[in-house]
């Protein structure tokens, strides 16, 4: 890292401890997106109510001890602990965090998780969603949530971003 700009203390507290705890994680995506943030207030895991949501079945943790802006690395340690060996953490009253062996994969899971949070919020507003069976959720997750599928699914979004911002990679 070069330069003399300010460091985002909260980002450092979370990401530095996550990477220390999980050497297999090369990238982590976290933001305060509207649907992830809204879903996080429910204090529960995403249900396997659709094919896309099955990607996160038994692959998410939840951090329930939100205490405001993360300023201490100790809280980053607790977030990493809540994530465990999973790919996604729901940070209650805060948002979502996804991980991966590459930026592409972490971002694809973030984008997909955001849409799945939106879908579950809509489904719950309409009634009582019906989850798929445990067996179906696992089979579907194994098919759609592997690194190759995630990487390939992200490429059209990456191409669109580069087309919209051609100097991005300069």
Regions found by a protein language model. Name each.
Residues 8, 12, 69, 73, ...:
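Electropositive phosphate-/nucleotide-binding environments in soluble metabolic enzymes
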Residues 61-97:
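A contiguous binding-surface segment within folded domains or other stable secondary-structure elements
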Residues 3-12, 28, 62-70, 124-135:
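Low-complexity, flexible helical/coil segments
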Residues 1-37, 73-85:
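Short HxH-centered metal-ligating active-site micro-motif
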Residues 31-71, 75:
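Class I SAM-dependent methyltransferase SAM-binding "motif I" and its flanking Rossmann-like core
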Residues 22, 33, 43, 66, ...:
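Generic secondary-structure microfeatures
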